[in-house]
Design a protein with these regions (language model features):
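Hydrophobic targeting segments
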Residues: 2-8, 27, 32-37, 185
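Active-site-proximal specificity loops/subdomain of glycosyltransferases
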Residues: 4-11, 19, 37-99
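Glycosyltransferases that elongate glycans
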Residues: 8-16, 33-44, 239, 245-251, ...
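Short, well-formed alpha-helical segments that are part of the catalytic scaffolds
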Residues: 12-30
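A short acidic, amphipathic alpha-helical/loop segment
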Residues: 22-23, 47, 112-116
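Short, surface-exposed basic-aromatic patches at helix termini and helix-loop junctions that form
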Residues: 28, 49-54, 115-120
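Short, well-ordered alpha-helix to beta-strand connector turns
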Residues: 31, 94, 102, 121-122
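Catalytic-site signature of metal-activated, phosphate-bearing donor transferases
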Residues: 75-86, 105-258
Length: 258
């Protein structure tokens, strides 16, 4: 019985160097079906439509128009479009949803674990997220209060669970941690192409979150300099395992100069 739908949204994924192509392929590997909300004027939608055509019957695409995108504001904009995909999956009749962001990849070792987890019929399942920094092969190693985003996120839940806030997690009444260590999501968002990072952060902070001013550290270097935020000698460490296979080629082309 088909019971697990993967969901994802992406807007202008090419412009801001999201690994959305790999993320969609990742969901196809372990989900029964995938719903993608996509848009933008940079070829993102066309690519998603193309991969949907190649996987006929397994992907539904919801078009995000420019007017719809600009009609939402604040960090809740992210959960709004995430929920567009989740609500569509709900209408299709799926029991569970795995929500992945367009700059994330699930490790292939976790595919079977996710399928195992949903057989236990819990409402939701906490997942581990590895936040990469400076290099696709290094991860942040600082206290949670210093991290730019969480290392535990709720992304697997019954289809009634909706995204909230800045879409970091789903909302649920109950959550199990029984599978947390084995469901591993790699966050590539801070290791995009170095010449894209500055504009990406400004776009997110100003155009999405609605901040009056973006982080002033961005003006201290022409190219994004990750060392301005975290000391490479003390604040990062090597990842604990090889990167997910689907992202290895992408990662090899994104090693920073400094």
């Amino acid at each position: 019985m088909d019971k697990l739908c993967g969901t994802l949204f992406v807007y202008r994924g090419n412009t801001f160097d999201y690994c959305f192509k790999e993320a969609i392929q990742c969901l196809l590997e372990f989900c029964d079906h995938v719903v993608v909300a996509a848009g933008g004027d940079d070829g993102t939608l066309e690519y998603v439509m193309d991969i949907a055509e190649k996987n006929e019957g397994k992907i539904n695409v919801i078009v995000i128009t420019k007017e719809e995108w600009e009609g939402q504001s604040g960090r809740e904009k992210l959960n709004y479009f995430t929920n567009v995909a989740i609500q569509y999956a709900d209408k299709l009749g799926f029991q569970y949803n795995f929500n992945l962001q367009a700059d994330e990849i699930v490790h292939e070792k976790s595919y079977a674990v996710i399928r195992e987890a949903i057989q236990t019929n819990e409402e939701s399942y906490m997942c581990t997220r590895i936040n990469l920094w400076k290099s696709p092969y290094m991860q942040l190693n600082v206290p949670q209060e210093r991290k730019p985003c969480s290392t535990q996120v709720l992304r697997l839940g019954k289809i009634s669970c909706r995204s909230y806030g800045d879409a970091e997690s789903l909302m649920a009444h109950t959550c199990t941690f029984d599978f947390t260590d084995r469901i591993r999501i790699y966050h590539m968002g801070f290791v995009r192409k170095q010449d894209v990072m500055r504009s990406k952060i400004i776009n997110m902070q100003v155009d999405v979150f609605g901040m009056e001013h973006y982080d002033s550290k961005l003006d201290e270097s022409e190219l994004f300099n990750p060392d301005l935020w975290f000391d490479p000698k003390t604040d990062i460490k090597p990842i604990d395992e090889p990167l997910p296979k689907l992202i290895q080629d992408w990662a090899s082309k994104r090693v920073y100069k400094n």
